[in-house]
Amino acid sequence: MENIIKSNPYSNALISTAENPQVAQSGALAGIALAVKDNICTNEMHTTCASGILETFTSPFDATVVDLLKQEGVSIVGKANLDEFGMGSDNANSWFGPVFNPLYPDEPHTPGGSSGGSAAAVAADMCHFALGTDTGGSVRYPAAQCSVIGLKPSYGLISRHGVIAYAQSLDTVGILTKDIDLLEKVFNILNKYDPLDPTSLTPHKRAKLKPPKPHRKLTFGLVKEYNIKGISENVKMAWSQIMDELIKMGHEVVTCSIPAIKNALPAYYAIAPAEASSNFARFDGIRYGSRAPEDRGEHGTLYAPTRQEYFGNEVKRRMWLGTWNLSTDAFNHDYIRSQKIRRILQEDFDEVFNRPNVLSGNEGQKANDEPGVDFIIAPTSNCAPYPLSKLNDSAPVDTYLNDVLTVPASLTGIPSLNIPWKTKQGNVGMQIMGQYGDDLGVMKVGRLLLDKCKELHQD
């Protein structure tokens, strides 16, 4: 709590804090402090989604992930700030004000988003780990910007029950921490089938997931399409250094191509807002949440004034975009076409990986004889955190490009782990991606690289 009192007034990482967090005497997580992203339901604190429309909303139940962690003795210290409803990548779109990156105390810098509060809370040692949600990069990108570890698990492994949906075919609950061992422990607690979540991977499918093989020579993919224009020299240097170190350790690095990556970002921004526009129909101020007094006016308006007053500009922008994508004029050209691109992207990734995809009808059999890879390593962000003042000089949609490196793993549902890689110019976020269900393998590689980075910088 001392670190919260010290750091939260500047960073604004936590929207609400527990007055007297309970400390359990037993359980795998006894004595461990947790911050929960404020779009994950808790029955003892408000769940606001950083939106005015839910400013006073308290859920009658805990999300499944919260319940599982409570059973293991975790202490919840607060609810973490975010971009409203998870829409954004700078954590500047919050009803409760922006989050400032605690690594830059002299000038407000972005912590990344949308789980910026979760990442900032971990970076400032307000908690041992935090829960976030990752729809298109919202755990990995802020983890990269705040120099912490962030996991987006395989879609369906961790329950979404009690997570207020943004885009249900993409939303995943992720974990942020500084400790790779704690990350694996929390993942194993949460990696359970949940009958309350219709998208939870069934026990039958889970039984097909193979554990990572014992230590052996691995093959890492260097995907050409991730080498996009605009990547800073420092990020390129970190990427190259990691690949060199893997070769020195006896592993193999091969160059490969996933052509559909170039279409991933526009496909994401057709699919995600379309799902959001449908999900957000429930926010009308009638059944729960804030309601504008004009809603009962003489003109008979029911909920338009409430949404106008309590939704932020970015939420309204994406709802308009999503509604358009589902309209008669755009449905076939934009939405259906984007779903086809998503399928092609999944097939392209399956062609690259050695392991089969248990979700594919052919069990992931490769259509060609080219050697596959075990893991893909690429940058999480193309540059270091920038001052929040920069947002004043850019168009709102310019920040959509922040997702360009993280969206492919979201569209395909594969696990992706951000780790901080130290360079002379500061830490760089690098992501490790594996085949669907190989989350433990991804964490194993993450531990390998974190140990190597520590070894290189012992002095």
Swiss-Prot record:
Alphabetical list of InterPro entries matching this protein: Amidase, Amidase_CS, Amidase_dom, AS_sf, GatA
Active site: K37, S114, S138
Subcellular location, principal: mitochondrion
Subcellular location: Mitochondrion
A biological process from GO: glutaminyl-tRNAGln biosynthesis via transamidation
Gene Ontology MF annotations: ATP binding; glutaminyl-tRNA synthase (glutamine-hydrolyzing) activity
Enzyme category, top tier: ligase
Reaction(s) this enzyme catalyzes, per UniProt: L-glutamyl-tRNA(Gln) + L-glutamine + ATP + H2O = L-glutaminyl-tRNA(Gln) + L-glutamate + ADP + phosphate + H(+)
UniProt keywords, alphabetically: ATP-binding, Ligase, Mitochondrion, Nucleotide-binding, Protein biosynthesis
CC terms in the record's Gene Ontology section: glutamyl-tRNA(Gln) amidotransferase complex; mitochondrion
Enzyme Commission no: 6.3.5.7
NCBIfam families, alphabetized: gatA
Family: Belongs to the amidase family. GatA subfamily.
Self-association and partners: Subunit of the heterotrimeric GatFAB amidotransferase (AdT) complex, composed of A, B and F subunits.
Summary of the function given for this chain in its UniProt record: Allows the formation of correctly charged Gln-tRNA(Gln) through the transamidation of misacylated Glu-tRNA(Gln) in the mitochondria. The reaction takes place in the presence of glutamine and ATP through an activated gamma-phospho-Glu-tRNA(Gln).
The protein's name: Glutamyl-tRNA(Gln) amidotransferase subunit A, mitochondrial
